[in-house]
Amino acid sequence: VQTCALPIFSDPCMQKLEESFNFLKTFSNDKIIYGINTGFGPMAQYRIEDESLSQLQYNIIRSHATGAGQPLPELYVKAAMIARLYTFLQGKSGVHKELALLITEFINRGIIPYVPEHGSVGASGDLVQLAHIALTLIGEGEVFYQGTKRDTASVLAENGLQPFQMHIREGLSVTNGTSVMTGIGIVNLIYARQLMQWAVGASVMMNEIAASYDDFMSEPLNGAKQHEGQQEIARMMRQWVKGSLCVRKRENELYNGKHEEKIFTHKVQPYYSLRCIPQILGPVYDELLNAEKVLINEINSACDNPIVDPDTQNVYHGGNFHGDYVSFEMDKLKIAVTKLTMLAERQINYLFHDRINGILPPFVNMGVLGLNYGLQASQFTATSTTAECQTLSNPMYVHSIPNNNDNQDIVSMGTNSALMAKTVIENAYQVMAILMMGIVQAIDCLDIADRISPRSQQVYKEIRAFFPVFREDTPKYKEIESMMVYLKKGRFQEK
C-alpha cells in the first residue's frame, strides 16, 4: 500500500465501468432512484428537480465534509482510496470512468486527501471521511502532497489534473460505502501479521534464554488438538528453534532414569507465558486468517447503494454500505492483538524479575545493582500500554447509537472499531519493542549468543547493530522508537 502504483486499467475494467454508467444513464431517465433525483437519508422523500440534479451531487460532498480530530495518516487514506476504487471496478455503481481514473492519478502521484479520524458511524458506510476524499476529487478541500498540507486546487493545477465534473450519481457513490474502515482494516491486518511473527520469534528466544524443554512445541503434543492455528504456531516455533543449543530434550534428561533429586533445580515445566505459546497465539493466527478473508471479500464487493446491475437491467436499493462485517472483524482483531500484547508483557516480567527467572540480574541490569537500573523503567511503559490495549478491546460492534432522524437506527461503528484496532496494534509494537530489547540484553547477560538458533542469532545481530549492549543508564525512548521501526520492516516471509 505504501509504495504501490496502480496500473492503467485493462479494457475489461473500463468496459465494465462504461456499461454500468451507460445503463444507469438510460435507466434513470423516467424513474425515481434514491440519490439521483431524491434527497439523501431521511430527506429521500423529497424529489429533486432536473435542473438541480448535478448540484445535488456536489451538495452531499460539501455538506458531509464535517470530520473532526487528528488527520488520518496518509498510509491509511491511501488504502481507503484503493478500497473505494475497487468498489467502483465491480461495475455496480454507475459512475463515469473518469472518476476511477482520477482516483488512480491521486494514488499514483501521492496526492493524499486530508481526512479527519472522527465522523463515521459505519452506516451509510463512512460518509463523513469519504466526503473529505470526494471533496478533493472536485478540487476543493485540502491534501497532503510531498509532505505538506496544501489546498487541493493548487496541487491539481501543479499536476495538470482537472477536478471531476459530476455526471449522474458520483457524489453519492464516492461518499457511500465501507472503504475507509476497510482500508484501515487492511493496513491493520498487515501490521498484525508481522507482529504475530515477532511474537513467535520472541517466544522461541525466551525459551532459549530459559533453557526450556522443547516438547511443548512438538508435533505430537500440538497435533492432539484439532486447531489449525495452534498447530501452525508450533510448526513455526520448531522452524525457528532449529539448530539451537539452548533448548533441552526431555528424553535426554528427565527420561533417562538417572535423576535422584528430591527437588529439581531446573523447572520441569516453565511458566505458561513460555510453555503455552501455541495455545495462546494459535487463536490469534486463526483470527488473522479470518480477518484476511473478510477484508478481501469486502474490498472486492460493491458496498454502494443503490446497486446498479446492467446484467439484470435493474437498480436495487438496500444496505451494502453497512459495515458490520468489518466492524465485527476489527473488534476480534484488537482482542487477538491485545492477548498477544499481554503475552509479551508477561514475558517482559519474566525477564526482569530475577526471583522468577532465577538466572538473570534484576531488569537485565548489567551495571552496578542499586546504582544502575537496566531496563527497569521500560516495564512501566509496557505495563501501562498493555492496560490501555485491554480497555480498548471492549467491542464497538455492539455500541450502536441511532441517529440521522432514526433513518440510521442501527449502525456498525466499523471505522471506530478499525481505528481502535490501529491504536491497539501500535501499542503492541511498543510492548514488543521493549520485549526485544530485554531479550537481546538477557542473551548478553548469559553470554549465549553463540548457542541460540541461527535465526535467533540473525535477529540478535540485527538488533545489536542499532541497540548495543549497555551497562550505564541512558534514556531509552529513542531506542524503543528505533526498535519499532525495525519490527515493522516486514522481514518475514509467510508460507
Please describe what each predicted stretch is:
Residues V1, A5-D30, Q57-P116, N207, ...:
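Glycine-rich, flexible loop motifs
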